[in-house]
């Protein structure tokens, strides 16, 4: 091999190594992980409305990129909808979680059953 060919080959190898080769993950996490951490680290600091807004924005970005949301994402959004009194949307998110992650079916069924029950009156 000539010296010029070796230089060209080395340049091609280095160019290939420097390309953005980060692996594509199975799910789009968006701000979900940070949001969950913030919710548990400082309860009550971030209102459900703000969390819903962040998650809905992440969902729109994921749909635009044809990506999936991670396990628990739809269930968490459903819980937030429930906190806001939007039970129809909560039900839909819990059903979506159950459909996308069948292993969560028993838990989602329990949450859906609780969604149907009226809250006990507080006195």
Feature-to-residue mapping (PLM):
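Flexible helix-coil transition and linker loops at the boundaries of alpha-helical arrays
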Residues: 21-25, 58-68
């Amino acid at each position: 091999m000539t010296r010029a060919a070796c230089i060209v080959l080395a340049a091609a190898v280095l160019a290939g190594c420097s390309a953005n080769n980060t692996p594509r993950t199975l799910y789009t996490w968006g701000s979900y992980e940070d949001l969950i951490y913030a919710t548990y680290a400082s309860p009550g600091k971030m209102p459900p409305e703000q969390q819903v807004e962040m998650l809905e924005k992440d969902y729109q970005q994921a749909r635009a990129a044809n990506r999936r949301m991670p396990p628990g994402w739809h269930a968490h959004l459903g819980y937030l909808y429930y906190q806001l009194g939007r039970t129809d949307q909560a039900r839909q998110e819990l059903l979506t979680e159950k459909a996308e992650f069948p292993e969560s079916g028993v838990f989602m069924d329990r949450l859906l059953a609780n969604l149907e029950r009226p809250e006990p009156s507080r006195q």
